[in-house]
Amino acid sequence: PAGQNTCAMKKLFPLIAVLATLCATAAQRPLQLIPQPVRAELREGHFAAPGCKVTAEGFASRPEGLIRVASALAAPHGKQPARKTRNTLLLQLDARAGIPAEGYRLRVAEHEAELTAGDESGIFYGLQTLLQMADADGNIPCAEIEDYPRYGYRGLHLDVCRHFFPVEFVKGYLDRMAAAKLNRFHWHLTDDQGWRIEIKRYPRLTQVGAWRSKSQIGSYE
C-alpha cells in the first residue's frame, strides 16, 4: 500500500504543479482591456461602483451624455439590490493636464475613481474602460491607467447599400465601436454615381453631390 500511495502521489504531482501554475498566472494576469492601454498598473482592492455618486468638474455645462454613461456603472448590477455607498466617481475635464487628444488618466481607489481628460472624448473613452473593468457585480479593480490613441482615425466600415440591416443592428454596431474606442463610422449608404439621399443637416450632399457635369466619356451638358 505504501508503494501504491507513492505511485499515486507521483502521478498527482504534475497535475498539482499545473494547477498551482495556473492559479499563479491568474493572480498575475494584467487587466484584459481592448485596446490595450499605454500604461496600466493593477492595485490591491476594488471600487464598488453600484450606488456611487457621479460628479463632474471643469465642464462648461453639465455633461448629461457622459453622466448617463457613468450612471450605468452606478446602477445595481446583476441580482445585487440597490445599496447606499459613499463611493464617488469623479469626471474631471482639464485642458491643462497635458493629456493627448482623446486620451485619459484613470485612478481607481477603494472609495473613489477619478477620471481626467483634456477633452470630452477622452472622458467618454475612459468610461468605456471602466465598463470593461467592471465585473458582474459592478466591482472595479483598483488600478492606475494612462491611455491615448496612436492614430487619430480609427474607423469601421458598414455597407448597407448591398446588404440591408435593421436600425437596431446599426445602433448595436455603433455601441461596439464605442466600446473598442473607434472614432470614425464609415457608412456606405449608396452606390449611385450621385448622392440621392436627402439629409437636412447636410444639404450640400444633394445640392452638389447629386450632380456632375462631366464623366469619363464626356459631358452631360
Where are these regions (language model features)?
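A periodicity- and composition-biased signal for non-globular, repetitive helical segments
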Residues: 16-17, 194
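Sec-dependent signal peptide recognition
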Residues: 10-16
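Acidic, contiguous N-terminal accessory segments
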Residues: 18, 24-154
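Feature activates predominantly on carbohydrate-active enzymes
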Residues: 98-221
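Short, linear, compositionally biased motifs with a strong N-terminal bias
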Residues: 18-19, 211
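Intrinsically disordered, low-complexity sequence elements enriched in Ser/Thr/Gly/Pro
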Residues: 8-9, 27
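Short, Lys/Arg-enriched N-terminal segments with co-localized hydrophobic residues
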Residues: 1-8
